[in-house]
């Protein structure tokens, strides 16, 4: 707060409390190396259906909500969001925005929760949005973080006429970015944001930087007002607690404490050093045969950036 007193935060849970879920466990999928969920518990996810299409993520869609669709549970969970916001406020940390679920279509071995479009609508419209508006009227509710390229799923949620009064914006990440242009064209009245950078595999190289550079162009060029990073600083090989090597903007040697600014850091600086709050996107071109995306900004000082 001393460096940036205007800084605010947004938040989205990976998993509801286990007792609120149909499988009573933090993950959706079983994996003997990282969790203790019995393999037979996965039957709830698809219930024997086999409609698989590898062109999409997820390649198979859950048929059940993993959050118990009981009004008592749904309201209690909405209250939990408010308690979370209040607790951070007491510590001087401003939570300005919440989203109902991190990656509702990631049926993972990590903390996760599968949701159907019907469940997403029900929780956001009937419970989360009205509860937040009542207890924390200054906090925004966004629909996120959407991680599927199955456009029919996103469209089914946003086409419910009640959604426009429940959420102010939509957050996309990973595969969700593929449907951003079409969704924004169909639903132009929402605000849009990118909610998680693709964190790579611990390479910390220029290829990762170029990938992030193109992602920033894509999301900002298609109307997103914010771009969020998953990792700012990691040590050594960038290995997470789950064993996944990832990239970051800054890499620290845990033995010496030496910090290295990675190529990805400079890719980000290319934008953040000039594209300040209030800057507008005038034109955007996706990369084509020339492999070069082009984006034109107008800053609050009426300067053009290309």
Language-model regions: role of each:
Residues 1-155, 160:
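Substrate-binding cleft and catalytic face of glycoside hydrolase catalytic domains
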Residues 8-12, 96-100, 140-143, 168-172, ...:
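Structural recognition of the beta-strand scaffold that forms the well-ordered cores
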Residues 104-106, 110, 143, 147-154, ...:
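Active-site clefts of carbohydrate-active enzymes
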Residues 273, 284-306:
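Carbohydrate-binding surface patches
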Residues 130, 134, 138-141, 162-206:
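Glycoside hydrolase catalytic-domain groove-lining segments
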Residues 194-270, 280-287:
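Aromatic/acidic polysaccharide-binding cleft in carbohydrate-active enzymes
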Residues 158-170, 218-226:
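Structural recognition of alpha->loop->beta junctions
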